[in-house]
Amino acid sequence: VTEKLPDFTDIHILPMFPYTSDDGFSVVDYLQINPDFGDWSDVENLAQERRLMFDFVCNHLSKSSKWFQKFLTEDENFKNAFISFDENFDSSKTTRPRTSPLFTEIDGKKVWTTFSADQVDTNAHDPKMLARLTEVLLEYVARGASSIRLDAIGFLWKQSGTTSMHLPQTHEVIKLWRTLLDTLAPNVQIITETNVPHADNISYFGKGTDEANMVYQFPLPPLVLHSFISGNSSALTNWAKTIKPVSDSATYFNFLASHDGIGLRPVEDILSNKERDEIAEEVLKNGGKVSYKNNPDGSQSPYELNINYLSALGSAEKLLAAHAILLSFLGVPAIYYHSIFGSRNDQKAVQETGIARRINREKLDKSKLYAELENNPERKQIYEKLSQLLKVRKNERAFNPYGNQEILDFGERVFALKREYGKKNLVSIINISDEIVTLSLSGLDIITQTVFSGTLNPYQYVWISLD
């Protein structure tokens, strides 16, 4: 981190706890570090160098966890810690992100399992369990977390006859945790992970001051990908016009790639079925995998794309231009480590495990990576140019995550926006097409420190100072 990523202020550590499945998201013990990774002293040492984001997988635990084992043995303090099957509970409308059974029988007890038979949902209805979860949250802060990512938080509260998704009680739990953190650790931020349509996603801002400090900008990855595949920025531009500043204490968590796939649900109301199908076709062509959902009429629709973002786009030039969009956008940008290091699809991992998401979860060997950053032209180009962009952005106050943003319309081959904070102003322009574009605009490009005369080469990007 110190050697190769000096310009990152924060690091998101994916689940670092003992686990039994789902690459870490089936946690056995919230408060132990997986010995394969080190121990708490390693985490605390890293927290001295960078701000850290911890994952709080509060919706579910591994069936091998001590808490669940105590539930199975009917320990008095854990008898309601998880959700048992109740024939009077109407779960017919429950939102399902998986095709696996909603209830799983484990040692004679049928329990709620949203994501898999190994991941048992916690019962936030139980005051004792909610108190335990709250203690975990506060322990993470004590251990050095600067941000807490609430994984799958939208599923937390279950209620008969509802979707058991985004329920008011879930929002109340987040408000409780936000109040505690604002009082006890005001510099710690809550980030909600809800990969759902945009209106539902931004509901986790609450009033802008009482729930999430940041929400994931889930429409951004598929919309940017669509722009480069089609050579047309219209959908991205029109959606971006709806994104406004939230408050002085809340903003967007922007990203293009992550350990998960690229979700298409967030753009169901933004892109047409045909446009989403076209993205899926391009992903398949570029070696990726597509997960489909069944529709009521018997048809299928793509809902998640499993592919490395560089492989999806096809070239280093497109990846760099895409990240110029990411780094310009209102909010806090987050770059997946495989993106800055120029990784491509890990087909071997998919073939060996049969798990589609492994295509973008390659575990890199440090010495091999360091050698390739020098000897592999694509890795070297991406790493050096993205690192340069980060250095420039770091010193530009107009990119303040709580500043203003105005989307500009320079035609469908370009995505452009104006960023403003205080007296600092700049215009970011990205050519998302394979054509030369000429604009009636000139000024100093702060990336290259040269005068931009109005001509953009294919996939070229500029940040024009207006000061």
Predicted features, each with a name:
Residues 442-451:
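Solvent-exposed beta-hairpin/edge-strand motifs
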